[in-house]
Amino acid sequence: MTQPDMSQILAQAQQMQAQLQAAQQEILASSVVGDAANGLVTVTMSGSGEVTAVNIDPKVVDPEDVETLQDLVQGAFLDAHKKVADLAQEKMGPLSQGFGGDMGSLF
């Protein structure tokens, strides 16, 4: 059995590292919008998980029912967070298979 060429292995590792860095940058440059109540409440989140905007349609603002509004904001946030995780899995998943792991769990 022949020995693997170390320079070839190193070159492949460097190429994979560059691909991972590019995917990470793409994720960080992205933003997603999570929503609740068919878009009446939306949360915009960056790829790093930072909430950059919250929009609430006045139709869902009822001073007598603050709990529903709180639930909708929480639901929109969770939806946005899931979309960031899905984006990370989409971008990093194929690359992480080379490492035998699930990189999506990092986000």
Curated annotation (Swiss-Prot):
Keywords: Cytoplasm, DNA-binding. The keyword Cytoplasm applies. Its main location: cytoplasm. It is found in: Cytoplasm, Nucleoid. One of its GO terms (molecular function) is DNA binding. SUPFAM superfamilies: YbaB-like (SSF82607). GO terms for cellular component: bacterial nucleoid; cytosol. Transmembrane segments: none annotated. The keyword Cytoplasm applies. Homodimer. Binds to DNA and alters its conformation. May be involved in regulation of gene expression, nucleoid organization and DNA protection. Belongs to the YbaB/EbfC family. This is Nucleoid-associated protein CE0210. It comes from Corynebacterium efficiens (strain DSM 44549 / YS-314 / AJ 12310 / JCM 11189 / NBRC 100395).
